[in-house]
Amino acid sequence: MKKFIYIILGVFAMVSCIHDESNLGEEPISRLSFVKTLPKEYPVEKMSRFVLEAPEVKQENQEKPLSYEWQIDYEIVSTEKTLSYDCNVAGEFPCRLKIYNEDGAVFYEFVLKVPYPYEEGIALLSAYGGESMVSFRNVMQEGEVFQKHVYRLNSPNVSLGKEPKSILYNANYASVYIAAENPVKVVRVDARTMEVQNVLKYPEPRLDRMIERGKYGIFFVGGGRFLNMDCKTENYINTFQQALTGKWGSMPDAYVDDHIIYYEGTWSSKTVIFDRTSKLFLVEGYMGPERVYEDILCDVLLAALPAQNSKNYVLVFKDNAGQIKVAHVGVDNVQVLSQYSDTKGSITESSCFLTSKKETLLYYSKGNEIYRYDYQSAGNFPVSSDYTVGETGDVIKEMVFDPEEEKLYVALDAASGDYKGCVYCYDLNTKALLWHERGVAGEVVRMIYKK
C-alpha cells in the first residue's frame, strides 16, 4: 500500500515539474500567419519565367528570422524569398511555399497553370493543296484566332495521307485521332499539343469515317467494312464483320454503310449497321446478323445520330420511292418509334446533320441555311430556316455544339478563295452571331469540339 502511495505521489510530482518548466523564463513563441488572402492559381505562358515574391506574414509576440522553401510538383526548387522558375513544360503543377522560423511555420498551397497550346476549342480537318490539314482555335480566351497547319507544325516527321477523311476526339484518353487515305493512315495525337503519340496499325485498305463507340472505343468504317477498336490497347475486333462476310458469314456480299448505330447500356451494348447491298438494317445477334427496323424501307442512309434519349437514334434516309424521311428509332429495343417524310423539301442528300442532347431537335442544312425539326412533332417540318450563315454561295459542311450546348459552331466552304474553310459561332439561346472567321482552312471535311 505504501508503494502504491509513493508511486502516485511521484507521478504528481513529475507532472508538477513538467508544468513548472514550461514557464520558467522562456521567450514568447513567435506565431506566424499570412496578412492577406492569397490566390489559388497562377496562369503562366509556356517558355516564360514565373517570378513570385513570398507573401507578407505577421509574427505574433516576437519577430524572428524567416526562412523559405518553395516546392513545385513536389520538388524543392528554391529557398529564396522570391521564387524565379522557368516554365518549360505545359500542365497544372501543385505548388507549396513554406515560411518558417525557429518556432513554427505557415504553408501556402497554389497551382501553377502553364497552358497547353491547344486546349479547349475547335479542330477543323480540311483538304488543302493536295494535303490533309488541321486548323485549331482556342475558344476560352477572347481574341484568339484559328491557327492553320497545327498538325504539320507539331508533328513534322509523320505525314498524313493526302486525302483527309475523319477526325475524332476521345476525352477519356485526351487524344485526337486523325484519319486519311492515299495512303491510308491513322495517327493518334496528344489533344493538347498535336504531337503524334502513335501511328495505328490499321489493317483495312479503305477508311472513310471514325465513329465514337462509347467512352473507350472507336468504329472505323470504309470500303463496306467496319472494325471496332479498344482505345486502351488499340486492338481491333471484327466479329460482327466476320459474321457478315467472313468464311462462315451469312451475308458475303454485305457492304456496311458509313453510319453506325450504337447503344451502350449498363450491362450490354447493341450495334446496328445498314447493309447497302440488301438494303437492310442488321443487329449483331447470338446466332448471326438479325434484321431490325423492317418498317423502314431505306435506299440511302444519310445520317444516324444519337437522340435526346440515349437509348434512341435519329435516322435520315432516302426511301425506295425517292422520298427523304426522318425516323426516330429505339436501339435498346430495336423499335421504330416514328418516321415522317420531309414534305417541305429542305433536306437534301448533301445536307449535314446534328442532334441535340437537350431537346428533341434535328438540325440540318441546305446551302448556307440551317433548319431545326422536332422529331417528336409528328412530321411538322419547318417552313423557314433558323440561321442564314455566311455569304451567298457558301455551303455548310459541318455543325457541332459545345459540351454544354450553349454555342453552335458551323463550318462552311466559301464559294471562292484560296482557303475556303470558314467557321461561324452562334449563341444557341439568342441565335446571335458571336464571332466568325473566314479563310481558316482548306475545303472542310470534318470538325470537332475538344476539351
Segments the model singles out, each with a brief description of its role:
Residues 325-420:
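Intrinsically disordered, low-complexity segments enriched in Gly and acidic/Ser/Thr residues
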